[in-house]
Design a protein with these regions (language model features):
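Terminal targeting signals and extreme-terminal segments of soluble enzymes
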Residues: 1-166
Length: 166
């Protein structure tokens, strides 16, 4: 477990943040929401895939801890990213969120490494049911679960279709 940065060591940009843990690769998803709130990092494991990010100043609330909205957004990216990796039925498809639940368990301080792992609980012809656990420097900070519709195919290659080791 790494110590969070002290207030006199602010992390205001990704250039000032410590490196991602070993084995994590930066993923880029073009423009839009993920580009503004990322970068996100992924690492393959025997069980599936881990997704993570470093808490920067732009992710925090006035108490200098990761805003709950950012953790919810992270959960809403973690679950379908994992589904794209684990489920052939999801590869290359848009997975709109039908339902997302999050239980906040602790806080993720500025500078902490947040990562999550998820699993598929059930797969039907039209939906994927998932759950995941999010940690900050090894401490459980959120439990997430969601239901995602197996939507239309993306046109052309899509970066979430399959994790490409890099």
């Amino acid at each position: 477990m790494t110590e969070p940065l002290s207030p006199d060591q602010p992390v205001t940009t990704k250039d000032q943040a410590p490196a991602a843990p070993e084995g994590f690769k930066a993923r880029h998803f073009g423009d839009g929401f993920v580009a503004v709130n990322g970068p996100l990092y992924t690492r393959l494991t025997e069980a599936g895939m881990q997704v993570g990010f470093r808490v920067e100043d732009r992710h925090t609330n006035p108490m200098r801890i990761c805003h709950g909205g950012m953790l919810a957004s992270f959960g809403d990216m973690l679950l379908p990213m994992t589904a794209h990796h684990l489920c052939p039925e999801a590869q290359g498809r848009f997975l709109p969120t039908i339902s997302l639940q999050i239980d906040y368990l602790s806080q993720a301080p500025l500078g902490s490494w947040v990562q999550g792992e998820a699993q598929v609980m059930r797969l039907t012809r039209r939906m994927i049911f998932m759950q995941g656990l999010v940690t900050a420097d090894g401490v459980n900070v959120a439990r997430v679960s969601g239901i995602f519709k197996i939507g239309a195919l993306f046109e052309g290659p899509h970066p979430l279709s399959r994790h490409q080791p890099g």
